[in-house]
Design a protein with these regions (language model features):
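Basic/polar, cationic surfaces and motifs that engage anionic cell-wall
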Residues: 1-12, 16, 46-57, 61, ...
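Cell wall/extracellular polymer interaction/catalysis modules
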Residues: 1-37, 43-46, 68
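Short, charged beta->alpha transition segments
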Residues: 63-72
């Protein structure tokens, strides 16, 4: 719980074309791993639709009810978003996901202009989200001051 400083991008680590539902994530995170809550605040589906998984507001703070278990050590100040796909370290984002990912991030930065965007693979030795978030953010016009280029592991 604290000031909202980061948006972290994740992948579901599933094959290209496989949709992932909220129910799938509940099964994987809560039932199988025993987590107390989901790992993500929202998911971009294959058709580009963004589904809120854990409700959040735009007040610049991560409240206890907004916390998700996306990356150990980062959850108290980070909003975690995931896209369906990314299995085997392959960027499988659809054109629809790409378009709405950009729109979602621009909207989040409108409400929280000091937030930085980062990939899960920048805070853990994983390949998730299967693409270079910093580089992609540059190509879609995210201001450099909103891109976290660091490696934290």
């Amino acid at each position: 719980m604290g000031k909202f400083t980061h948006i972290m991008i994740h992948c579901t680590d599933t094959p290209e074309g496989r949709e992932v539902s909220k129910e799938d994530l509940i099964k994987w995170h809560i039932k199988e791993r025993g987590w107390s809550r989901l790992g993500y605040a929202g998911i971009w589906h294959l058709d580009g639709d963004f589904e809120v998984l854990t409700p959040f507001d735009e007040d610049g703070e991560i409240e206890s009810w907004e916390i998700t278990n996306g990356a150990r050590g980062w959850n108290g100040w980070t909003r975690h978003f995931v896209y369906s796909g990314g299995g085997n370290n392959v960027d499988t984002r659809t054109v629809y996901q790409l378009a709405n990912m950009r729109s979602t991030l621009i909207q989040e930065l409108h409400y929280n202009p000091d937030v930085k965007i980062i990939g899960h693979n920048q805070v853990s030795s994983k390949y998730c989200p299967s693409f270079d978030v910093s580089q992609w953010c540059e190509t879609i016009g995210i201001p450099k001051e909103n891109i976290d280029y660091g490696k934290y592991y």
